[in-house]
């Protein structure tokens, strides 16, 4: 009996120490993350206040059922998106993986937080509402996107089933993401280059408004400068500008190229790479170029939507593809600026609505 009591006391002491150790860990993470975050935010915002709510780790764990698969939305690189409810309000919750964020990626995590906070006043960026500093890396809390994130073919996936969106909505998404990129390029003294435009970074809210997310690969040019040499080539294969890939030189046209590929995917519903009739992989850019050069854009395959499109709508899809091909010209001098792309897409969208 005495030995059992001794054992129980020992277990209680151990449990108490573990709880204390866990609490100390959370406090250390809070102080470290808070210090870095505050420093970066002050530098970025010139001391201006940006209201961001602070959440506790218990709130985050309860909202996501301790990061359960039932709350899973999407996984991308070194983070996972969850949906969760806190105080009767739905949120998108972004958790960085402490196992996948290597030393050189730590700065990208904080860059994502700071730039997301700065972009929160623009309707086409996913709005950052708060964060929790009680994890190895801050857990971010964003506005809820009811219709989720675009899949690799520019559609949405519901209960495992892919669904392509109506042409009018796909045009709207293209225009809104073009607006978001133009904002990055023009709204600040230092041009911001996004560097990783692709469907998996685009969320849709309850009004089907497109929201660009993940600014971790973004890079700012020096004030008055039009280019910068990056330390590393960051982005997604298939969407990368070949000039940037070869030289590491980043300009606003780096985004224009990636957006061109993005637009082709979203408008046609064809993935960036697909299997050709000969069984070999085909890139969407080469495929579209071939059709355009041979005057066969009318032969574009529209998976699952061909029968639903009018001849007028097909002509508008062709116009979008031709615009996208201009974005992907080899020489940057031959590519339009993002603001020009956004204006052209608005013109095409309005023409479709009248058709």
From Swiss-Prot:
The enzyme class is: transferase
Quaternary structure and partners:
Interacts with RPP13L4/ZAR1.
A molecular-function term among this protein's GO annotations: ATP binding
Name of the protein in its database record = Serine/threonine-protein kinase ZRK3
* Annotated ATP binding sites: 73-81, 94
The catalytic residues are 196
The uppermost taxa in this organism's lineage are: Eukaryota, Viridiplantae, Streptophyta, Embryophyta, Tracheophyta
Task: Identify one Pfam family in the record.
Answer: Pkinase
Please tell me the species this chain comes from.
Arabidopsis thaliana (Mouse-ear cress)
Question: In the Enzyme Commission scheme, what number(s) does this protein have?
Answer: 2.7.11.1
What UniProt keywords are attached to this protein's entry? ATP-binding, Kinase, Nucleotide-binding, Transferase
What function does the entry list?
Answer: Required for RPP13L4/ZAR1 recognition of the Pseudomonas syringae type III effector (T3E) HopF2a.
Q: Tell me where in this chain the Protein kinase domain is found.
A: 67-353
InterPro entries found in the cross-reference section: Kinase-like_dom_sf (IPR011009), Prot_kinase_dom (IPR000719), WAK-like (IPR045274)
Family as reported in the entry's similarity comment: Belongs to the protein kinase superfamily. Ser/Thr protein kinase family. ZRK subfamily.
Which BP terms in the Gene Ontology apply to this protein? cell surface receptor signaling pathway; defense response to bacterium
Question: What do mutants without this gene show?
Answer: Reduced resistance to Pseudomonas syringae expressing HopZ1a.
């Amino acid at each position: 009996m005495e030995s059992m009591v001794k054992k129980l006391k020992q277990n209680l002491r151990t449990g108490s120490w573990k709880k204390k150790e866990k609490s100390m860990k959370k406090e250390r993470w809070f102080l470290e993350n808070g210090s870095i975050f505050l420093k970066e935010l002050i530098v970025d915002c010139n001391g201006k206040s940006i209201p961001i709510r602070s959440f506790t780790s218990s709130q985050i764990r309860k909202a996501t059922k301790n990061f359960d698969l039932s709350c899973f939305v999407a996984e991308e690189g070194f983070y996972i998106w969850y949906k969760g409810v806190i105080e009767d309000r739905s949120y998108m919750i972004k958790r960085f993986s402490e196992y996948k964020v290597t030393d050189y990626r730590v700065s990208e995590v904080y860059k994502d937080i700071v730039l997301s906070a700065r972009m929160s006043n623009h309707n086409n960026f996913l709005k950052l509402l708060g964060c929790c500093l009680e994890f190895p890396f801050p857990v971010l809390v964003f506005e809820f996107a009811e219709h989720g994130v675009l899949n690799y073919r520019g559609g949405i996936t519901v209960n495992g089933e892919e669904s392509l969106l109506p042409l009018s909505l796909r045009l709207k998404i293209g225009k809104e993401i073009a607006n978001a990129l133009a904002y990055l390029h023009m709204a600040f003294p230092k041009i911001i280059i996004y560097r990783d435009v692709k469907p998996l970074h685009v969320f849709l809210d309850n009004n089907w408004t497109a929201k660009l997310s993940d600014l971790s690969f973004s890079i700012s040019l020096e004030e008055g400068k039009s280019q910068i040499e990056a330390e590393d080539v960051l982005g997604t294969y298939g969407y990368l500008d070949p000039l940037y890939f070869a030289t590491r030189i980043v300009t606003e046209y780096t985004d224009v190229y990636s957006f061109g590929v993005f637009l082709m995917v979203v408008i046609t519903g064809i993935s960036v790479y697909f299997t050709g009739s000969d069984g070999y992989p085909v890139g969407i850019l080469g495929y579209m170029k071939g059709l355009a050069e041979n005057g066969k854009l009318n032969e574009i395959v529209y998976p699952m939507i061909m029968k639903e499109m009018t001849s007028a709508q097909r002509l508008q899809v062709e116009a979008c593809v031709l615009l996208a091909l201009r974005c992907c010209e080899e020489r940057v001098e031959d590519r339009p600026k993002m603001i020009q792309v956004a204006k052209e897409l608005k013109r095409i969208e309005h023409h479709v609505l009248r058709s």
